[in-house]
């Protein structure tokens, strides 16, 4: 269920409370929620996942991404979340927004766009929807 982007990040579709324990068993120490509350009435709410994470001894951060797109502060928040070096699991409805946010964060930090595309592709995700933004960030624009 968890798709590995690199040694420090996996992404996933919406997780359940039980998935928090599975993530911990895989060595995850940080859960990043990229899904806004209320997007799917049947999905666990942010506070529920946060409580399960804290009960399991995991760190938790919410950086909700709506379908309206990504912002600079969201990219910066993802950079900050990953900067601590924790093994992280990021999730949203399908894992796509989590992957694209990671991709933008990596580009802003100077990772080559083709390497970003390769890593995302290895996990089954396509960065084409934000490739122009990735190229601009990687170029320092």
Regions found by a protein language model. Name each.
Residues 92:
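Short cysteine clusters
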């Amino acid at each position: 269920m968890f798709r590995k982007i690199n040694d420090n990040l996996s992404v996933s579709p919406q997780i359940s409370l039980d998935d928090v324990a599975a993530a911990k068993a895989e060595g995850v120490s940080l859960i990043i929620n990229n899904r806004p509350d209320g997007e799917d009435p049947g999905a666990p709410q942010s506070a529920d996942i946060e409580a399960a994470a804290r009960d399991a001894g995991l760190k938790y951060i919410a950086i909700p991404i709506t379908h309206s797109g990504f912002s600079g502060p969201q990219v910066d928040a993802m950079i900050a979340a990953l900067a601590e070096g924790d093994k992280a699991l990021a999730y949203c409805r399908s894992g796509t927004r989590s992957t694209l946010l990671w991709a933008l964060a990596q580009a802003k930090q100077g990772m080559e766009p083709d390497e970003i595309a390769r890593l995302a592709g290895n996990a089954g995700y396509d960065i084409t929807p934000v490739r122009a933004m990735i190229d601009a960030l990687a170029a320092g624009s």
